Amino acid sequence: MPLTDPSEPPPRSAALRRWLGNFWPAPLGIDRREHLRMACGAALGVLLSALLARWWANVWGIEAPWMVASVGASAVLVFGLPSSPLAQPWPVLAGSTLSALVGALCALLVPDAAWSGALAVGLALALMVQLRCLHPPGGALALFVVLNHGGGVHLAVFP
């Protein structure tokens, strides 16, 4: 004989646990070797980018951030989702470069950072879509350039 009546609703804790369980992500079908490849690839890609950007900044005597966070976001896309259209060479390179240039232009033309930042992200998105080089970290890069007060166009060459 069951201890609970089937016509009674389940206890609140069980209902809450089931509801919260709906937010838990589905398991990934990626084995440990692929996890390791992704993590090592991203780490090595960021390291190589950082070393190259720092060397380039020293060669040209540029005093600016030699790497920004959007490089890490790009590495997640390139090494974590390599078959994604957003992680292909054209979107990564053109989307980032275009966004940095748009950010520098907006910072130059619009003095208020709130307006300039919003305009930079919106214009960068519109241009990336038009040129088929949509890369989400590009939006972050456009905003970073504005918040860095233009940061110079050199950020477009090595973000």
Feature locations, PLM:
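Active-site beta-strand/loop microenvironment that shapes enzyme catalytic pockets
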Residues: 101-102, 130, 142-145
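Acidic, glycine-rich active-site loops and adjacent beta-strand->loop/helix elements
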Residues: 81, 123-125, 147
